[in-house]
Amino acid sequence: MRRLKNLPGLTGTGKSNTSNLGEFRLAVDQSTSRKISQFCVRLEAKQRLRLNYGLTERQLLRYVRIARRTRGSTGQVLLQLLEMRLDNIIFQLGMASTIPAARQLVCHRHILVNHRVVDIPSYRCKPRDIISIRNRPTSANALKSESLSGNEVPDHLTLSISKTGEPTGLVNHLVNRESVNLDINELLVVEYYSRKA
């Protein structure tokens, strides 16, 4: 995990979190000047993407296949598909501290999309979708335990908080590459799956 560096969706932080042990290991890795193969670079990029969004290998392969069939740059379409997942939107809005926490909110039926309960974390949000919390005590308590973080909301989303303190999110438009918080070269992931997809 430490080798994959900063994963904002998994750790909930935007900054790298290294301990003394990690710094020591980094110094040892740099001192041994091994040549890293292209396969290793692609595999690491794939693992970073998969772990950040909390996907299984099969799910990521399915998203790559969908991105290949869609018009446009395969890498950018892949990131767009992953960023528009409901669990990621909830994380980006600050309703959950991590993507796994957002997934739990969705699976426990605390989230409404366009005033309907959605319990599928991989639900693909569309422009003009309204994301809110169910109006029941357990849903309010679940959200209170996940304090609304002070992170900036990306430009493709809008967050408004009512007088009662209930957050409501709006998807303005599809996400663009500049709004993605993850530092990754998505083309390496596409190249990794070039023979499988």
UniProtKB/Swiss-Prot annotation:
GO biological process, one term: ribosomal small subunit biogenesis
Gene3D superfamilies, A to Z: Ribosomal Protein S4 Delta 41, Chain A, domain 1, RNA-binding S4 domain
InterPro entries to which the protein is assigned, alphabetical: Ribosomal_uS4, Ribosomal_uS4_bac-type, Ribosomal_uS4_N, S4_RNA-bd, S4_RNA-bd_sf
Domain S4 RNA-binding stretches: 84-143
GO MF assignments: rRNA binding; structural constituent of ribosome
Keyword terms of this UniProt record: Chloroplast, Plastid, Ribonucleoprotein, Ribosomal protein, RNA-binding, rRNA-binding
Subcellular location: Plastid, Chloroplast
Known role: One of the primary rRNA binding proteins, it binds directly to 16S rRNA where it nucleates assembly of the body of the 30S subunit.
Family: Belongs to the universal ribosomal protein uS4 family.
Extra remark: A slightly longer form of the protein may be created by RNA editing; however this region of the cDNA has not yet been sequenced.
Assembly with partners or alone: Part of the 30S ribosomal subunit. Contacts protein S5. The interaction surface between S4 and S5 is involved in control of translational fidelity.
UniProt name for this protein: Small ribosomal subunit protein uS4c
